[in-house]
Amino acid sequence: MKRKNFVAIWFCALLLAMSTLWISEAIAAQAEQPSGISMAVGRTKASTSFREVMINNPDIRILVEKSIKQASIINPDRKTNPVQSLDELYGFLDYTVTCMPWNIMPEEQYGSFSTKCDQSILYVYWLLDQPLEELKDKELFYPSVEYLEPIYTWLTEYNNTWRDFLDSEASWKQEYLDMLLRDPSWNLDKGWYESPDNWHSFNEFFSRKLSNGNSRPIAEPNDDRVVVSPADSLPQGVWNIDESGRFYADPIKREDGVIIKDSTFVSVEQLLGEPGAEYAKLFHNGILTHTYLNYDDYHRYHFPVSGVVEAVYKIPYANAVGGIVYWDKNKELYVLESNSLSWQSVETRGCVLIKTDYGMVAVIPVGMGQVSSVNFIETIKPGTKVKKGDELGYFLFGGSDCVMLFEGKSGFKLSVGKGEKGGYSAGYRHVFCREEYGRFLGK
């Protein structure tokens, strides 16, 4: 009898211990869920690999925790800053990699689709983009843990995990298409694009094709002096390249004028990478321009000039945000300052060099932020003759930028008219792909 009582007591104690452990784990899991975000997901590769980075690099873990703490001081509101501890970041990473781009952050906070995507994309970078005193002498693009290895490399793994979801059929439903059809910013009612029947994932929609050439008519198709825009985008301006191949990157400023990154010099050699080293000197004393694609733009890019392809290659890099993210307290929005130069040289990018009657031209599509995959049409190879307006490639989801380099003798001049300045606009109007972008005034 005593033995039976002992066994019963022991069994009850075991159940109590197991229940206590289960409750503790449930509480810990709940603590990892950012306020306002419901997550019923298990551990994913995104958070598992990040946790390993933290365990194996205790010094970096301290810096990450400091970055999160610094962010919580700048914006303590959990509605717009739900992650305020490292444990909460683990949960947030798991949550985001199976999310649609417009619902990572609480939807009621923002109005337009573009703003929802923008804030959702920028948020995780903002957490890791806080300037830290300990990193100021590390010669990073910006003294934040975003650019510190192994986090810099981990970001690509995180982004690829999300890309796998956006490539899958689970990322596309009729309700998503209906929602996008109702949003006028996408212009899906104008007959510009292929049939929606061709879209079986979000990325197939995002990299949608035109229905026909008339959707984006080519400006002056028989006049090779006219350079057309490579993409639907916002031109950011023109920069002169000096005799040593360097161009001056202006200081990066917030909208209130506060400088968040000092001016720097960047070289053509850095931008073209090692595969393009033999062509770099052609662009010394040349001209650079770049143009920004927003989320709701058509995300295929086309040749801006006619000629013969000399080289085509990719430069694999990490998926950094494409500038510097800061919190605008007045607007209650995360803002990406990407109008300036220099960040393109630390991003994944492609490059196509084209020999034209006006000298060599380099077209450099640049991925920005999450899942900005740079892809070329398979038929584009050295020796291929191309006409301006021909399709060159496409981006998958994320922000994107197109850089163009021209030789000095080309006399390239930007001809796009002025527009309202603010946000991602540098003061030029939005242009459509294959619309006139500039002209060659030299020979």
Task: Name each model-derived stretch.
Residues 1-2, 26:
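Universal eukaryotic N-terminal targeting presequences
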Residues 2-11:
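Bacterial N-terminal signal peptides that target proteins for export
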Residues 10-21:
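Bacterial N-terminal signal peptides
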Residues 22-31:
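Signal peptide processing junction and immediate N-terminal pro/mature segment
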Residues 30-443:
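Contiguous, well-folded functional domains in the mature portion of proteins
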